[in-house]
Curated annotation (Swiss-Prot):
This is Alpha-amylase. It catalyses: Endohydrolysis of (1->4)-alpha-D-glucosidic linkages in polysaccharides containing three or more (1->4)-alpha-linked D-glucose units. Its EC number is 3.2.1.1. Monomer.
Length: 520
């Protein structure tokens, strides 16, 4: 079996519906050779919206399996797949909600999405394409409908009572969380419990060794099912991460979890969600392989939106140095927007050329780029959350596999925002993504190289070099709506331009509007 490229399956696991951990698991991957290479382009997919195999309107695991060839067909010579290396699958565990971030059974698949057999089949088919899958693992909280929480409500002497955090006479019930939210919630039995996000998601008590053991068992279970790693939801909030003591306890827990997972699979890939400033994020690299760079994502989108560089390369270099001080092997998790944010195409007011620029920047920076499903075809959407998670558009109209779990407000089809329409259009956003991913993968400098900012005499140009094993590529992005001329080193040849019109004569480089140029 070839070493898999990386797929991030964002299984934000809503907590296990069964009270036991004794679910037998067929081990899907056997005898994998260790590999240190965890670099790759990931695709974040919301299964419910992706592809419907059983015609009930909801996306499912069989549908995702059927459409793996859209993501990566396993043939490096074809041009019609995205050629991503990994899939991050959003939650697939049983849950009472549409998003499934409130788990009722950590050891199973939501029946709406399929079953464990479907999951294992997906893992095996991903293997065939050298694609890795990571699951979004939700360990901070369970659903309030989880059997553990229900048992805790019914019986104060239940062992599950101490799985959660309860108020006592000294508790300040008016305490607010880090974004001003209410964190103490009244249970049906009249008591108050702690929940960072809302009353339907009671936080687990990680001061309880039984909880830590339980969640380690959950991780081991899914590794045995064939998953290659985890996207760790709300990694900041296991303890109160905004406090020094809470942050320290968080890191100790993630060290414990990491050690247990690596014992099960030495190549496990762990990426965490710590939604905060780089200084808060950085210490978590002591425990994890990768963390999402929200600060850099904001700079990319705001710069492209404004049409002038707001310090993208400087920020990328600074966070790179900071993160490496905690983990020299860190892998930055870079992205434009995700399932909790307004879609990048809406942020860019539907401007396809700006969307191409944002993609080009993302796919030439250090780290593992994450593409949110639909980003590659220009899907739009603004909060509330349901509207940034609308059905993926395969067709201009209706067609086989098109999901319909909700009526789209933004992405209704018929306006060119579909795989069907953009595959036929040579200069489409989809084909731009296909091309830029391949350009990245063809040059080790862009995958593994260090970054250094290049000073240019134009705020409309984002410029940096990527260097690996003594070889460098200089990257220039014109993010304005006008052609730009900049001075560059006389040496070096133009090896790639995102579209025609770029020209290098000695030390003068002309870059058309919203275009990217590589010089080597």
């Amino acid at each position: 079996m070839k070493g898999k490229k990386w797929t991030a399956l964002a299984l934000t696991l809503p907590l296990a519906a069964s009270l036991s951990t004794g679910v037998d698991a067929e081990t899907v991957h056997k005898g994998k050779a260790p590999t240190a290479d965890k670099n790759g382009v990931f695709y974040e997919v919301y299964v419910n919206s992706f592809y419907d195999a059983n015609k009930d309107g909801h996306g499912d695991l069989k549908g995702l399996t059927q459409k793996l060839d859209y993501l990566n067909d396993g043939n490096s010579h074809t041009k019609n797949d995205l050629q991503v290396n990994g899939i991050w699958m959003m939650p697939v565990n049983p849950s009472p909600s549409y998003h499934k971030y409130d788990v009722t059974d950590y050891y199973n698949i939501d029946p709406q999405y399929g079953n464990l057999q479907d999951f294992r089949k997906l893992m095996k088919e991903a293997d065939k394409r050298d694609v890795k899958v990571i699951m979004d693992l939700v360990v901070n909280h369970t659903s309030s409908e989880h059997p553990w929480f229900q048992a805790a409500l019914k019986d104060k002497n239940s062992k599950y009572r101490d799985y959660y955090i309860w108020a006592d006479k000294n508790t300040d019930l008016n305490e607010k969380g880090s974004w001003g939210q209410q964190v103490w919630h009244k249970a049906p039995n009249g008591e108050y419990f702690y929940g960072t996000f809302w009353e339907g998601m009671p936080d687990l008590n990680y001061d309880n060794p039984e909880v830590r053991k339980e969640m380690i068992n959950v991780g081991k279970f899914w590794l045995k099912q064939g998953v290659d790693g985890f996207r760790l939801d709300a990694a900041l909030h296991i303890f109160k991460g905004q406090t020094p003591e809470g942050a320290k306890k968080n890191i100790l827990w993630w060290n414990e979890f990491r050690d247990a997972m690596k014992k099960e699979n030495p190549n496990v890939y762990l990426t965490g969600e710590v939604w905060d400033q780089p200084e808060v994020v950085a210490p978590y690299y002591q425990s994890l392989d990768s963390l999402f760079n929200f600060d850099l994502a904001g700079k990319i989108v705001s710069s492209v939106k404004a049409g002038n560089d707001q310090g993208i390369a400087t920020a990328a270099a600074a966070t790179d140095e900071l993160f490496k001080s905690y983990n020299p092997n860190k892998i930055d998790g870079i992205f434009l927007t995700n399932h909790d944010q307004n879609r990048v195409m809406s942020e860019l007011s539907g401007d396809v050329n700006k969307a191409k620029s944002a993609a080009s920047i993302l796919l030439t920076l250090p780290g593992n780029p994450y593409i949110y499903y639909g980003e590659e075809i220009g899907m739009t959407g603004e909060k509330p959350d349901e509207l940034i998670r609308e059905p993926f558009r395969w067709y201009e109209g209706n067609g086989i596999g098109q999901t319909s779990w909700e009526t789209p407000v933004y992405n209704k089809g018929g306006n060119g925002v579909s795989v069907e329409a953009q595959t036929k259009q040579k200069d489409s956003l989809l084909n731009h993504y296909r091309e830029m991913i391949r350009v990245r993968q063809q040059h080790e400098e862009l995958v593994k190289g260090t970054l250094q900012s290049i000073s240019v005499d134009s705020k409309e140009v984002v410029a940096y070099s990527r260097t690996y094993k003594g070889k460098s590529i200089s990257v220039y992005h014109n993010i304005s709506n006008q052609p730009v001329k900049v001075s560059v080193a006389a040496k070096g040849n133009l090896i790639f331009a995102s579209e025609k019109g770029a020209k290098k004569v000695k030390n003068q480089l002309v870059i058309p509007a919203n275009r990217t140029v590589l010089i080597k």
